[in-house]
Amino acid sequence: MADDTPRQRESISLTPVAHGLENMGAEFLEIMEEGQLPHRHSSLPEGGGSRSKAVWKPFSRWRSLQPTVQARSLCREHWQLFEWISKGLLSTAYIGFLIVACLLDFPRALALFVITCVVLVFLAYNLLKRLLGSKLKKCVKFQGHSCLSLWLKRGLALAAGLGVILWLSLDTAQRPEQLVSFAGICVFLVLLFAGSKHHRAVSWRAVSWGLGLQFVLGLFVIRTEPGFVAFQWLGDQIRVFLSYTEAGSSFVFGEALVKDVFAFQVLPIIVFFSCVMSVLYYLGLMQWVILKIAWLMQVTMGTSATETLSVAGNIFVSQTEAPLLIRPYLADMTLSEVHVVMTGGYATIAGSLLGAYISFGIDASSLIAASVMAAPCALALSKLVYPEVEESKFRSEEGVKLTYGDAQNLVEAASAGAAISVKVVANIAANLIAFLAVLAFINAALSWLGDMVDIQGLSFQLICSYVLRPVAFLMGVAWEDCPVVAELLGIKLFLNEFVAYQELSQYKQRRLAGAEEWLGDKKQWISVRAEILTTYALCGFANFSSIGIMLGGLTSMVPQRRSDFSQIVLRALITGAFVSLVNACVAGILYVPRGVEVDCMSLLNQTVSSSSFEVYLCCRQVFQNTSLEFGQEALHNCCRFYNHTVCT
């Protein structure tokens, strides 16, 4: 009788088969290295035996392959030695090339020399961290607990505060306008504290350290000669690097369009810069820099790991890309930490847009410095406006890791960066068209309403020039330049910073071209100090159109926290706007005029082919000087470019 019960299928393991194949392959390679091959007609020994005991006969064809197999085996055994030899030869060749380049023309090889030094510093740091990292960490931790007691910390803070006050009192004796900028910082901080969510919970350690780091960075960049030269050099290198965009855009759009049309001249720079940033992220360089900046701010300010990483990332990426660095942790972050994330996004600009603003002619070193200085200031002011009252889960950086993207190779990373920028470029172009059209409509409507009550020339810019004039003055801008700066602040706040920087570039171009300062009752350009302070004040995404961008980006990552994001987004926007204003005030305290004095006698007593800012300044001295100190040649040169009563 047949058994109807189904038989259980027996599992068959292929592991012995695999091991057998591996053994046969290894045995076969060993025989090949000996130059032998089993003969086709070889028979097994009497009494049986395995195939491995067959009679092997030499074979000339396999003997010819013996050197190749031996070389392969040698490389496999000593691959690490060959790797070190290759690295040594390449390093020696590179060092020799660098030495020859520096000996021939050091200024020409300066960029390569600086890059080499930076790479060597990174390599030395990683080597020391690998060898002595744990020991140094224990030593520093021990010293911190034993020496830096509470009274010593307070004493150091008091000494630092008194030092700043003493320095300001001595430094502002020659330039009183710096005191106005200092008063502006105090006013802005008082206003932010008045609007704080939890006044008694403010972490003054985070506020003081954040503002202190911002001041030290500004002091290094603006006041010290090495810092100023370094950032000026870095800005020049970025400008040269971005000029290579013209090769690609000229091929696609044509040289005529690239030179004459704004969209084809500026927007391709964003594509190129986004591609480069994507490559740097793939290589891990950006993550390394972000981690080190975040570590410095976290150690000094006592903030959590996630919020500090997001703010540090905002130095290089936009308000929607920086939260991606901490995307897995957004759901568990406190409201104060989310407020920091939003404030950091509003207080800085994206690295891709940095290239576009530099192409406008905006001072590159000021843009770079403003982006770096805004990071600690954003943390400080955010903790002032929305202090931490909950228990954070991310006090330690353990378990918090940065992603390296999904690209599999360098080419894919570059291609992905260029593809991502298409959406950014389209968004910028669409916003420019929409906002400029809306601005023109608003101005036309305001002018129409103003004509009804005999107010001529009423416009959005005119209203902003009156409403925001006190803000511009508190930044440290001269009163005669305040209306123009207030207009730009209004455009940045109610439209976007792209339009504001474009307007600022036009004022700067007119100044450099030597245009007259006033054309009727309208100012044609502003002073260099006002340009620098405005550059700092406009450096941020804090405008009302960014509210939707911020909410859309964060909500798409964590939909369940939509109500939390909506609750604090407006407060974060205002805080981000104040970060840019405080940044401008710090620049106003530290800014000193630089440049070589122009010899007006030598400049004007020769034929001048075109006007410039230096020519205008010298001609203004000629028109104001009633004596014959400059001579008729100087007066003739000035009257060729400017109309003045003296010329008649």
UniProtKB/Swiss-Prot annotation:
Cystine bridges: which residues?
Answer: none
Q: Which GO terms describe its biological process?
A: cytidine transport; nucleoside import across plasma membrane
Q: Which UniProt keywords apply?
A: Cell membrane, Glycoprotein, Membrane, Symport, Transmembrane, Transmembrane helix, Transport
Sugar-bearing residues? N605, N625, N643
> Which residues are on the Cytoplasmic side of the membrane?
1-83, 130-147, 197-201, 287-294, 361, 449-470, 553-571
Q: How would you describe this protein's topology in the membrane?
A: Multi-pass membrane protein
Name where it's found: Cell membrane; Apical cell membrane
Entry's Gene Ontology cellular component terms: apical plasma membrane; brush border membrane; cytosol; nuclear speck; plasma membrane
Which segments does the topology annotation call Extracellular?
105-108, 169-175, 223-265, 319-339, 381-427, 492-531, 593-648
Catalytic activity entry: uridine(out) + Na(+)(out) = uridine(in) + Na(+)(in); thymidine(out) + Na(+)(out) = thymidine(in) + Na(+)(in); cytidine(out) + Na(+)(out) = cytidine(in) + Na(+)(in); adenosine(out) + Na(+)(out) = adenosine(in) + Na(+)(in)
Determine if Magnesium is one of this entry's keywords: no
Domain of life (superkingdom): Eukaryota
What Pfam families does the record point to? Gate, Nucleos_tra2_C, Nucleos_tra2_N
Q: How is it modified after translation?
A: N-glycosylated. N-glycosylation is required for localization to the plasma membrane and the transporter activity.
- Give a short account of what the protein does: Sodium and pyrimidine nucleoside symporter of the plasma membrane that imports uridine, thymidine and cytidine into cells by coupling their transport to the transmembrane sodium electrochemical gradient. Also transports adenosine, an atypical substrate transported with high apparent affinity, but low maximum velocity. Therefore, exhibits the transport characteristics of the nucleoside transport system cit or N2 subtype (N2/cit). Involved in renal nucleoside (re)absorption.
In terms of NCBIfam families, this protein maps to: nupC (TIGR00804)
Q: What is this protein called?
A: Sodium/nucleoside cotransporter 1
